[in-house]
């Protein structure tokens, strides 16, 4: 939705153009139909409510943490352990209010369950992991903050990315190809919830965007 420095070319602009007044207005005129959010430059699924009754029902499911969300991401290095559960408090970064951080005292509880699907080991290139993340909560920047907490970051993440990743000269071409990622390598792949009017479980799955798929294909080809 429109935010600081980004008032055009948003999902809300497209929704208003296509559906005009056929959207819920529980969040006011600036966010019609928007029940939840995903980070800017993250691809994948969002659920949109066309009326206030559905919006209220879906909002409660998000509040109860009963909606199932699964993300795929590419991260630098290897997360230890390979599979696990991250449970912390997350609050706004005091030094940079646009970022979030893990907090020992203040903040909202955030839980991410993760599973390493594959580790790519390519000569002269830092290891890269394909990771599946399932959210029990949906805090702002949650996956990215939790990965930083574990000592890593997403490929293409300009806000939380690691600054000390070293590439040898021979792999400048590889680095340039990674730079073609359209944002961080994070994709909201599946979303499942109880339909607000049909009262049955519905599940949706989104294909990987082309830039993510090309990067994954590149890693698979180089790692053998």
Predicted regions and their residues:
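RNA pseudouridine synthases
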Residues: 1-85, 89-94, 211-220
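Residue-level signal for inorganic ion chemistry
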Residues: 15, 47, 73, 114, ...
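Short flexible coil/turn linkers enriched for glycine and charged/polar residues
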Residues: 40-41, 67, 108, 139, ...
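Short beta-strand segments
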Residues: 71, 84, 88, 110-112, ...
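Short aromatic-glycine motifs in intrinsically disordered, low-complexity regions
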Residues: 97-105
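Pseudouridine synthases involved in rRNA/tRNA modification
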Residues: 105-109, 115-118, 122-126, 146-224
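Short histidine-centered loop motifs in beta-beta connectors
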Residues: 131-134
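Short beta-strand segments enriched for Tyr within beta-sheet-rich domains
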Residues: 139-147
């Amino acid at each position: 939705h429109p935010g600081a420095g980004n008032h055009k070319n948003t999902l809300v602009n497209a929704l208003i153009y296509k559906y005009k007044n056929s959207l819920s207005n529980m969040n006011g005129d600036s966010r019609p139909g928007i029940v939840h959010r995903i980070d800017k430059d993250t691809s994948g699924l969002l659920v949109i409510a066309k009326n206030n009754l559905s919006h209220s029902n879906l909002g409660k499911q998000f509040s109860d943490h009963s909606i199932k969300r699964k993300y795929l991401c590419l991260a630098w290095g290897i997360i230890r352990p390979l599979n696990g559960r991250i449970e912390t408090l997350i609050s706004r970064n005091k030094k940079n209010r646009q970022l979030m951080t893990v907090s020992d005292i203040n903040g909202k509880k955030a839980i991410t369950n993760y599973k390493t699907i594959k580790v790519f080991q390519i000569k002269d290139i830092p290891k890269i992991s394909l990771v599946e993340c399932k959210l029990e909560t949906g805090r702002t920047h949650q996956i990215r903050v939790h990965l930083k907490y574990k000592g890593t970051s997403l490929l293409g993440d300009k806000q939380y990315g690691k600054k000390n990743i070293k590439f040898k000269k021979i792999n400048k071409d590889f680095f340039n190809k990674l730079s073609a990622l359209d944002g961080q390598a994070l994709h909201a792949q599946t979303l499942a919830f109880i339909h607000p009017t049909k009262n049955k479980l519905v599940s949706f799955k989104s294909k990987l965007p082309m830039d993510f798929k090309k990067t994954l294909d590149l890693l698979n080809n180089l790692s053998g």
